[in-house]
A protein has these predicted regions:
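Helix-rich terminal scaffold detector
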Residues: 2-35, 39, 43-222
């Protein structure tokens, strides 16, 4: 191994370490400067709840129901008047939308798209959705924030008098690492909420679990 190769190898290793450190600092800065909120979880099959040392989580804001045909253009970027879209069926479009990023405008009061069942324990509601984190209709009189997600599943729902699109959103906060022995606390809990930090770019981070009114991390440290 000649000296030039050694220098190149060391340089690559150092660059990777520096990149990792910068990424960690960036992520921590997002958490430190973000906004903390509490999200209500919804029950899932207990057999799927725990996976090793991780708990699977699902939220009241995970399923978004959008009504009327305008949602193709306003919510999903599908312009029915665009000639390039006319040859694409709605089914093809819906299929291609899976995996795409989506931004959810949450408010402290239910309105607009808040057609999904919301329990009394919830404090944040889906107000609108968009392809970008810019919302022209953001209400000034209601506390609001934007959270970024990814379309996990999307389906059409037809009834005799209505038409809807149901979107399942993955926010990247659907799994949480548990210390050994803490799984039973979650399995036996009557109510589980999640403290989440929302960064300025919409990315969400779990900071704690609230199990039957008790913060899990705080109780451990105490």
């Amino acid at each position: 191994m000649n000296a030039r190769f050694k220098i190149a190898l060391v340089s690559i290793i150092i660059l990777q370490i520096v990149s990792l450190v910068v990424f960690v600092i960036y992520q921590e800065n997002l958490k430190d400067t973000g906004t903390k909120i509490v999200l209500q979880t919804i029950p899932i099959d207990p057999r799927d709840l725990l996976r090793g040392e991780y708990v699977d989580l699902r939220y009241e804001i995970s399923d978004v129901t959008v009504e009327n045909m305008s949602c193709y253009r306003l919510c999903l970027g599908y312009d029915l008047g665009d000639s390039s879209n006319r040859s694409r069926s709605r089914k093809d479009f819906l299929s291609s939308a899976q995996g795409e990023n989506i931004y959810i405008l949450l408010t402290k009061e239910p309105y607009r798209l808040s057609t999904q069942a919301i329990s009394s324990g919830s404090s944040w509601y889906v107000y609108d959705i968009s392809e970008s984190n810019s919302f022209d209709n953001r209400p000034e009189e209601i506390e609001s924030l934007v959270i970024k997600g990814r379309i996990e599943e999307i389906e059409e729902i037809f009834t005799e008098i209505d038409y809807q699109i149901r979107i399942t959103v993955d926010y990247g906060i659907e799994q949480y690492f548990l210390e050994e022995g803490k799984g039973l606390l979650i399995e036996n809990a009557d109510d589980v909420k999640v403290e989440v930090t929302i960064a300025s770019n919409g990315k969400a981070f779990i900071t704690d679990l609230i199990v039957d009114g008790t913060y899990l991390n705080q109780s451990v440290s105490d």
